Amino acid sequence: MSDYYGGAHTTVRLIDLATRMPRVLADTPVIVRGAMTGLLARPNSKASIGTVFQDRAARYGDRVFLKFGDQQLTYRDANATANRYAAVLAARGVGPGDVVGIMLRNSPSTVLAMLATVKCGAIAGMLNYHQRGEVLAHSLGLLDAKVLIAESDLVSAVAECGASRGRVAGDVLTVEDVERFATTAPATNPASASAVQAKDTAFYIFTSGTTGFPKASVMTHHRWLRALAVFGGMGLRLKGSDTLYSCLPLYHNNALTVAVSSVINSGATLALGKSFSASRFWDEVIANRATAFVYIGEICRYLLNQPAKPTDRAHQVRVICGNGLRPEIWDEFTTRFGVARVCEFYAASEGNSAFINIFNVPRTAGVSPMPLAFVEYDLDTGDPLRDASGRVRRVPDGEPGLLLSRVNRLQPFDGYTDPVASEKKLVRNAFRDGDCWFNTGDVMSPQGMGHAAFVDRLGDTFRWKGENVATTQVEAALASDQTVEECTVYGVQIPRTGGRAGMAAITLRAGAEFDGQALARTVYGHLPGYALPLFVRVVGSLAHTTTFKSRKVELRNQAYGADIEDPLYVLAGPDEGYVPYYAEYPEEVSLGRRPQG
């Protein structure tokens, strides 16, 4: 395997897969179980999350399904409680196609409320419990829920956001209300669960909303069951004796779909954490005797940034699954913490395809068997470029390109609740009349043997000196500097220049001081000239979404200038390094005088 830019690219060869195949074949029973459950389900079949869970409860009734602190719930008890919850919802008029808003923090009740909702044939609208004000009102408006189940201390946020009770929030129940009403409700499997078809909608999952109001993406039972087969059966390949730890919020698909489906596939245990804490993470993993965990975003980097402890390897984890383990820290992470297998994947809540690292190849998002295309794109619009005949242009073999995913009967695009927003994501008549493709908005780099690596979001990539700059590449270079704890990169405009110049916001490690010459040596040693960040802003902390993605929009809008209160530096050249910002610098860049060398 060959690498460049600190491991950002790996060439996958046949020998790499052949040497890893025996390990995959050893897990054939788990793979087959997932395939039988998920891949054989057809959209019109009577297969659903509720019926699959009922099947597992009948098979594995005495196994522990959920752990949360000192609480434990078996598959049998969880199914009975979910049935009682479903009866409570049905008594309030919830039926097929209705929406139940769920605004709950991580706990067994959240999983049970989801199961109860889908057993009714209804749709679980998984709300981000951090939302307030206009954003919460917007999300509630999209759901138009018949019933809203909320934490008792979050009910006031619903009232204060201005949502109309009857139109937007429906019948508001606290989780304590549901539990109280459920004590006298029937525990038998509801008939409504058997009437649900795989093509029916199971969840609404909200996008992170980094560039505006969140959109509600649609997750059908069919797609969730396919996720069970892919992530649970082919990816994690858990055994019934395994415990999967997840501290990710259950309103996110990595928890609700990847973690929950993988556990249910094998009759394994899901250990829920209240929230992510870098300092407590391994202690909680050890306390739960977890053998696997799910991650997202920068979680792995946060764990690496913690001081080394004797407990770093005092765990039983053998496999982890998620997206966002950066290539530049992959080897350091797996070596320090003794993680034998990384099931990195690429997917999107609204997407219709996925890559998954089945073979444990380092520094890759894995393989996808789906019909895909890597194409040329317009950086300003995010749209694929078309040739003189109006057809989309594929990139040369091995070159990074915008990822398109074919939309067809076997690979449908469920989209958003907003049909206009859904249509904007589709590319029609791309390669021939009548075809249809989903525009992922992501640049991916093919690696061979069906594998690919994530490069950047199109909204983050910028163009400078006629070249496309991937922010992930620049962030990897900056992060290799020993003083940098965390960073995010974005493009900013400079008058009388084309494109956008690179700017970074960084946080420093505890006790470290900014060294402009040393940082310049780092970036010059790792990056081509057009990718060098010209501005560096030293901040106390970086804002993130609740799923650990950097919020760049505000930083990009603030850009640079004398009104920035944080320490701000500019790149003078390879010898002078980064020096304090001065007002003439942007003009010097436009005239080609800076950076020198």
Swiss-Prot record:
GO terms for cellular component: plasma membrane. Belongs to the ATP-dependent AMP-binding enzyme family. Keywords: ATP-binding, Fatty acid metabolism, Ligase, Lipid metabolism, Nucleotide-binding. It is an enzyme of class 6 (ligase). Coiled coil: none annotated. The gene is fadD6. Induction: Expression is significantly increased during in vitro dormancy (at protein level). One of its GO terms (biological process) is long-chain fatty acid metabolic process. Catalyzes the activation of medium/long-chain fatty acids as acyl-coenzyme A (acyl-CoA). May play a role in the uptake of fatty acids by trapping them metabolically as CoA esters. May also play an important role in the channeling of fatty acids into triacylglycerol (TAG) for use by Mycobacterium during its dormancy. The lineage of its organism: Bacteria, Bacillati, Actinomycetota, Actinomycetes, Mycobacteriales. Pfam families: AMP-binding, AMP-binding_C. It catalyses: a medium-chain fatty acid + ATP + CoA = a medium-chain fatty acyl-CoA + AMP + diphosphate; a long-chain fatty acid + ATP + CoA = a long-chain fatty acyl-CoA + AMP + diphosphate; hexanoate + ATP + CoA = hexanoyl-CoA + AMP + diphosphate; octanoate + ATP + CoA = octanoyl-CoA + AMP + diphosphate. This is Medium/long-chain-fatty-acid--CoA ligase FadD6. Stimulates fatty acid uptake in E.coli cells.
